[in-house]
Amino acid sequence: MKNLKDLTYGIVGLGIMGGSFAKAIRQNILSQSGSTGKILVCNRSTACLSMAVNEGIADEAFTQDKTSELLKKSDIVFVCLYPHATLEFLKNYKNDFKSGAIVTDISGVKGIFEKSLPELLRPDVDFIIGHPMAGGEKEGYAASNAKFFVNHNYIFCRQTFNSEENYNLMKTLVTELGFTRITETTCDIHDNKIGFTSQLCHVIASALVQSARDPEITAFGGGSFEDLTRIAMINAPLWTELFISNKEKLCAHIDSFHKKMEEFRTAIMEEDSQKLKEMLEETREKRLMMGSVCTVSK
C-alpha cells in the first residue's frame, strides 16, 4: 500500500471543508518524520490561497485557471465543491488527472454521481464516492481547523470499479484525519438515510424559525430552541441544491414527519392524555435504541 506521508494531496475548493482537510492532512500525516508529501490547493478566490501558503498548510497554491497543473501532480484529489459543480469539474478536467490518481468528493447527495461516473472518468483514475459527516454554521477557510473531523462519521459508497488497494488507502486516510466510524453503503441508501438524518432536520429547523411570529422570541427560549434551530443558520445556495437533488426521498420523509405531527396535534386537541403519554414514552424508547451519532462517549 502507498505511504500516506509521501503522497501529494490536491484540494479543490478551499472553504471550511477543503481547508479542514488540508489542515488535518498537514497536522496528522505530513508532520510525520521523513514525510515527503505535499499539499496543493486551488480555489476561485485568491485570499484563502495566500492564507494557506502563509500558514504553512499548503506547499503550492493554484488559481482557478491553473487547476490542470494541480491535478497533474496530485495522487489524491479532494473535490470540495457543491454536487453539480463537482460533476462539472470531473467532466471538464477528465483528461487532466494524474494517471493512477484517487479522486473523491464531499457531496451530500450521491445518486447523481452513480449515474454519471462511468462516462466522466478515465479507467486509470479511481473515483471513490465519499461523504464526511461534519459541518458547521460558519463558512470559509477561516472557519476551518485541523480537528474539524475528530469523532465524526465518514460514509463511502463503494463502486464495483474501485480498486481494493485504493479503497483501503482511503479508509486509512480518513481514520488518520480523525473520523472514528466508517460506513460503507450504496448511493441509494445513502441518499435515503441522509435525507432523513440531515436534510429533513434542516427543513424542520428552517420551518420552525420561519413559523416564529415574534422576532424577540429568543428572550423566552431555553436550550430546546437553541438545539433545534442551530442548523437553521444555513448556507442557502448549497442546501437548495441538496434538497432539490434529493427531492423524492426528502419529500417522502417530510410527508412521514407531517403525518406524525398530525397525530400529536390530534392527541393534544382531543386531550387524549393516554394516547399522548404512550406516544411520548414510545418516542423516548425509540430514541434510546437509536444510539448516539457521536462515535466517542463524552
What is each stretch, according to the model?
Residues 44-45, 81-82, 106:
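Short beta->alpha hinge that forms the Motif I/post-I loop of the SAM-binding pocket
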